[in-house]
Amino acid sequence: MKIKNSLKSLKARHRDNRLVRRKGRIYIINKLNPRFKARQG
């Protein structure tokens, strides 16, 4: 999982990326291609 300050560019890397908010953190998840997972930090 990548940890980035800004997720907007990471979200654009794949069209199946979803922005999800869990426990106050913002994540990008991708069910089809899990290598695009990221967390804002």
From Swiss-Prot:
Q: Which GO terms describe its molecular function?
A: structural constituent of ribosome
One Gene Ontology biological process: translation
Sorted keywords for this record are: Ribonucleoprotein, Ribosomal protein
Q: What does the entry list under GO cellular component?
A: ribonucleoprotein complex; ribosome
- Tell me yes or no: is Mitochondrion among this UniProt entry's keywords: no
The record, for PROSITE patterns, names: RIBOSOMAL_L36 (PS00828)
For this chain, the family text in UniProt reads: Belongs to the bacterial ribosomal protein bL36 family.
Task: Name the chain's protein.
Answer: Large ribosomal subunit protein bL36
Organism whose genome encodes this protein? Rhizobium leguminosarum bv. trifolii (strain WSM2304)
